[in-house]
């Protein structure tokens, strides 16, 4: 079975790309021959090539735009991208014919590359729904009618959460919910939750406004009477936002309570050293770091929205609304260690029990399309 995966990025610092690598590993282990098309060179291609996966660079462009973009500018860019993408689609068409591909898988909704070629060649198309488009997020499709027509004509769409499935239900009736597979921590925790002198809090996510790191920093300023330390891990993707974070930290004398690190490929192992993990994102279609935190046995406190609320429902974590409420939840957790441990245990059982079969289910879906 030959499967072509189409990635919207050449980077390897996002959940979509990490999940794609995990899926391809599973495919190789189960006798499937994967190929991957990428829009540009980068760490993802290097990783795939090291795994023996054949890749090709075809310079297709996204079909989404920032919603704040002026309408005239957006329309002009859309027309230019249509021309470029049609040219690149010809290259994809020839690639699919040359390799006699059995199935095409588009890994995100950020691109539509390959969808037209798959339709013309009558090749089954599976499309992953990993992102919100339109409200409440900052991005949307250039042309919604065209976008939803292509999505609705896919053989099947895979929603990564119930929240995402509900979001697209108005436009699509060909979707199925399959949670991404997640790997259990390879190491065990070295100490019980809340057993050390300092409560260790961690937030993993690239630093930009929609990831909400300011919620955590503002909450920290209201908890200086407690022995706590906050670690932020993630790339600085928004200079103005990072500057705001640093200014607030200095103004409120929080530097000794805060460690700010860049992206770390081993970040998930730092979860095993943490008591509380935060997800302050404004909107999560899935929440890979949330699941990793649950699996690692942390007490997870998340923003009460989207898939974060889905994952932490039924007593699997704590939910907050606003930085002041976040500080209240953190204080409660520290002052109630026994109850916090019970919540973390329930979350860990859910994490380990619910995210082990995703890749198997996806591959079974692929096979059912042939």
What spans do the regions from the language model cover?
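A conserved mid-protein helix/loop that constitutes part of the nucleotide-sugar donor-binding site
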Residues: 14-22, 199, 208-222, 243
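Glycosyltransferase donor-sugar binding loop
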Residues: 37-43, 204, 229-243
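Carbohydrate-associated surface elements
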Residues: 163, 181
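Nucleotide-activated donor-binding/catalytic signature segment of Leloir-type glycosyltransferases, i.e.
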Residues: 242-263
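Aromatic "clamp/platform" in nucleotide-sugar-dependent glycosyltransferases that forms part
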Residues: 282
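Short hydrophobic beta-strand element within catalytic cores of glycosyltransferases
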Residues: 299-302
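Conserved acidic donor-binding segment of nucleotide-sugar-dependent glycosyltransferases
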Residues: 314-324, 332-338
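A charged, aromatic-enriched C-terminal amphipathic alpha-helix characteristic of glycosyltransferases
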Residues: 338-368
């Amino acid at each position: 079975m030959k499967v072509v995966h189409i990635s919207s990025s050449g980077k390897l610092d996002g959940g979509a790309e990490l999940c794609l690598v995990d899926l391809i590993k599973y495919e190789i282990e189960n006798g499937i021959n994967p190929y991957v098309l990428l829009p540009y060179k980068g760490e993802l291609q290097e990783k795939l090539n090291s795994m023996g996966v054949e890749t090709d660079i075809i310079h297709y462009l996204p079909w989404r735009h920032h919603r704040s973009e002026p309408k005239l500018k957006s329309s002009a860019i859309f027309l230019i991208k249509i021309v470029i993408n049609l040219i690149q689609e010809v290259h994809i068409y020839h690639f699919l014919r040359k390799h006699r591909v059995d199935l095409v898988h588009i890994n995100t909704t950020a691109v539509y590359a390959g969808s037209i070629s798959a339709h013309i060649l009558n090749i089954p198309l599976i499309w992953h729904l990993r992102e919100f488009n339109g409200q409440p997020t900052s991005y949307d499709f250039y042309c919604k009618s065209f976008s939803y027509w292509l999505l609705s004509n896919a053989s099947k769409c895979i929603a990564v959460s119930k929240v995402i499935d509900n979001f697209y239900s108005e436009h699509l009736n060909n979707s199925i919910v399959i949670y991404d597979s997640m790997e259990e921590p390879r190491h065990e925790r070295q100490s019980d939750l809340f057993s050390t002198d300092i409560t260790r809090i961690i937030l993993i996510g690239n630093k930009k406004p929609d990831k909400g790191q300011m919620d955590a920093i503002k909450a920290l300023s209201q908890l200086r009477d407690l022995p706590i330390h906050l670690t932020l891990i993630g790339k600085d993707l928004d200079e103005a936002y990072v500057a705001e974070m640093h200014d607030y930290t200095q103004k409120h004398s929080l530097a000794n309570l805060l460690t700010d690190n860049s992206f770390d490929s081993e970040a998930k192992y730092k979860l095993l050293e943490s008591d509380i993990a935060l997800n302050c994102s404004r909107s999560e279609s899935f929440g890979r770091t949330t699941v990793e935190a649950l699996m690692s046995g942390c007490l997870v406190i998340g923003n009460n929205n989207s898939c974060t609320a889905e994952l932490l429902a039924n007593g699997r974590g704590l939910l907050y609304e606003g930085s002041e409420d976040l500080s209240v939840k953190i204080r409660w957790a520290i002052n109630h260690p026994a109850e916090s441990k019970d919540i973390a245990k329930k979350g860990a059982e859910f994490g380990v029990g619910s995210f082990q079969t995703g890749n198997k289910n996806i591959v079974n879906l692929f096979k059912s399309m042939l």
